[in-house]
Amino acid sequence: SRKKRQWRRAYDYILKKATFVKDGKQLLLKSPENTCRIDALKKCYPAAKFINIFRHPYALIPSTINMFTKEMDNFCLNTPAPREVIEDVSIDLCARVYRKAIHELEEMKPEDHIDIRYEDFCQDPEAYLRKIYQQLQLEGYAEARPYFEDYLDSQKNYQKNHFQLEDRIR
């Protein structure tokens, strides 16, 4: 469709610009919006690799609810939707997006995607970075490792957000 072609041209332009700014280095994009575009992205960029870092829904959904609540507060011209509506929409959206994503990832060759539990990655990021490079058949891990170590060291005091899922939603 026309809208899809427009999106592809715009997205391609952004990626080319980012690649130019980064002197042609391979891009790593962290974009939750791309979770629902996996198949489209793979068709546009057949050599693309996907890292699916997933969380338990009880951790994911409260974060999504928080994001939507903030967006409603910041951008809503009328009275924001009641919290129950935001909760229902968040749960439904997460379920639909991740069902689709899981199906699309399962259709790919193993060397084109990797699934990693967020909690496992946080426990041993260096091991999982190595595993990502191996499974996706990426080159340059040895050269990148010192940069990973420096970055991970800089994040030691990072405090994660902790949102709780209310019992009535479970």
Describe each region flagged by the PLM.
Residues 2-9, 15, 19-22, 65-170:
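PAPS-dependent sulfotransferases, especially Golgi type II membrane carbohydrate sulfotransferases
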Residues 30-31, 41-66:
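Conserved phosphate-donor/acceptor-positioning beta-strand/loop module used by diverse small-molecule
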Residues 35-39, 125:
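Short, well-ordered alpha-helical microsegments
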Residues 1-7, 31, 38:
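Extended, H/D-rich, highly charged conserved domains that either
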Residues 23-26, 49:
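Loop/turn-to-beta-strand initiation segments
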Residues 28-32, 118:
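Short His-Asn-centered micro-motif
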